[in-house]
Regions:
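C-terminal amphipathic alpha-helical "assembly" element
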Residues: 197, 204-205, 215-221
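Small/polar loops that bind or transfer phosphate-bearing groups
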Residues: 40, 207
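Beta-propeller domain segments
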Residues: 7-13, 20-31, 43-44, 49-180, ...
């Protein structure tokens, strides 16, 4: 079983001693209770899903850090390597150093893996589902669906929608496409905030909205 645990802070500002065993995905043996870190340096990994292909790889959607401006840092979706390190808190999106973090750790930065796919800054990309739903039209035939909870500190706002990232084979192959939007009114006030996403057994896409207290089901008319 894979278990995602987010950080206790934005960039370690509460003390790195308070981040022990956090900002990582654990691999847990349910029968014995034994566990070990599977992937580390992930500020807030939320959604997880296995990608397509004969040897499925685990992917996650990661909610990255704030307070570096409206256009940094992009949230992202990435495949995971066993024992891979993805930078947090010392660097972001690979080896871009966050100078706010003390003490620095150049050795950790040097081994930080750049993620596979940027999902935009402050989108709060949380939910993740990967598959080929039969109930959606051809443009959404195979790829990843991401629930974007939406920004709280960006102008203009970002996120507040569900996007689709097409895959070719086992890899992302194009720009994100909106699947479900309209969660902001004309004055920029939220009337819904997508979180979890899942593919149901009848070919539809389920979207949990924790502001509207609603689960939406999306499929072709």
């Amino acid at each position: 079983m894979f278990v995602a645990i987010g950080s206790n802070s934005d960039h370690g500002e509460r003390g790195l001693e308070n981040e022990t065993d956090r900002a990582r995905i654990w691999l847990v043996d349910i029968a014995s209770g034994r566990h070990r870190p599977y992937a580390t340096g992930l500020r807030n990994p939320v959604g997880m899903a296995f990608g397509p292909g004969p040897a499925p790889v685990l992917w996650t959607a990661v909610n990255e850090r704030d307070e570096l401006g409206s256009d940094l840092v992009p949230d992202y979706m990435t495949s995971l390597r066993d024992d891979g390190f993805y930078g947090w808190p010392w660097s972001y999106y690979g080896q871009h150093i966050d100078t706010r973090v003390a003490p620095p750790n150049p050795e950790a930065v040097a081994r930080a893996i750049a993620p596979d796919y940027a999902l935009g800054p402050h989108t709060a990309s949380l939910g993740l589902a990967i598959g080929a739903p039969s109930g959606l039209p051809a443009p959404f035939a195979a790829g990843a669906f991401i629930g974007q909870h939406g920004s709280w500190n960006r102008r203009p706002p970002s996120g507040y929608k569900v996007v689709f990232v097409p895959f070719a084979g086992t890899r992302p192959s194009g720009p994100p496409q909106d699947v479900l939007s309209g969660f902001l009114d004309e004055e920029g006030r939220a009337r819904g905030r997508p979180v979890g996403v899942a593919l149901d057994g009848r070919g539809g896409l389920l979207v949990a909205d924790d502001l509207g207290d609603t689960v939406w089901r999306v499929r072709s008319a």
